[in-house]
């Protein structure tokens, strides 16, 4: 759970994890949500996959992640040997070079990537992968990422600082409601992608506004 007096420690024992989970659920029950660090509820993938098992559809490099949250395209390069970082369906992949490009993708297949792409996996069973994706695709997150990035010409996200990102985590039913609303709005934006540029821009701004509003919560009155 969030403790502003101490730096978070994400290398927790099972007993500490159970206690942390209990505190999150208690705060959700009392206040309607709990403020958490990203590292409280998610982790970076440590699993590996052989490069020979990958193809242009399942290998994801930073170059075939599309800017402005547009997902990914097929890779023009696939390593032939060695081992890659593994990702699974429901993981969130984020380009870690020049975070301001907002390269992010919710995996709909399993595959592999390299060290220039972060693979973020939920480590608790009461956060929806799609909800976590929407949290991490927000402008607020990318601003935070840039504020803590390293390097001038080619800034790189700071993996340790990223795990300290703070957001509000509501109960699972509220997550489902938010995801359903944002999915409908996302579909609407995609449906008009062939329209006039001004209309597309207006819809996109509306989507971003409502996404940010839906990810903010007021405490319940006790």
Regions found by a protein language model. Name each.
Residues 1-222:
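Charged, alpha-helix-forming regions
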């Amino acid at each position: 759970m969030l403790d502003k007096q101490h730096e978070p420690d994400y290398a927790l024992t099972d007993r500490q994890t159970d206690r942390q989970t209990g505190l999150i659920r208690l705060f959700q029950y009392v206040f309607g949500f709990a403020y958490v660090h990203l590292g409280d509820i998610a982790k970076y993938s440590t699993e590996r996959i052989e490069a020979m098992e990958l193809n242009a559809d399942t290998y994801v490099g930073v170059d075939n992640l599309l800017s402005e949250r547009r997902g990914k395209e097929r890779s023009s390069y696939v390593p032939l040997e060695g081992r890659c970082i593994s990702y699974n369906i429901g993981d969130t992949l984020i380009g870690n070079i020049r975070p301001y490009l907002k390269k992010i993708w919710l995996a709909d297949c399993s595959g592999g990537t390299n060290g220039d792409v972060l693979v973020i996996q939920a480590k608790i069973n009461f956060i929806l992968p799609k909800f976590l994706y929407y949290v991490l695709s927000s402008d607020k997150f990318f601003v935070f990422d840039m504020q803590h990035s390293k390097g001038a010409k080619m800034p790189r996200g700071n993996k340790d600082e990223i795990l300290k990102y703070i957001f509000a985590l509501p109960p699972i039913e509220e997550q489902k409601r938010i995801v359903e609303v944002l999915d409908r709005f996302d579909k609407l934006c995609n449906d008009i992608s062939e329209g006039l540029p001004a209309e597309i821009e207006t819809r996109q701004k509306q989507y971003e506004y409502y996404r940010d509003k839906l990810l903010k919560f007021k405490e319940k009155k006790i």
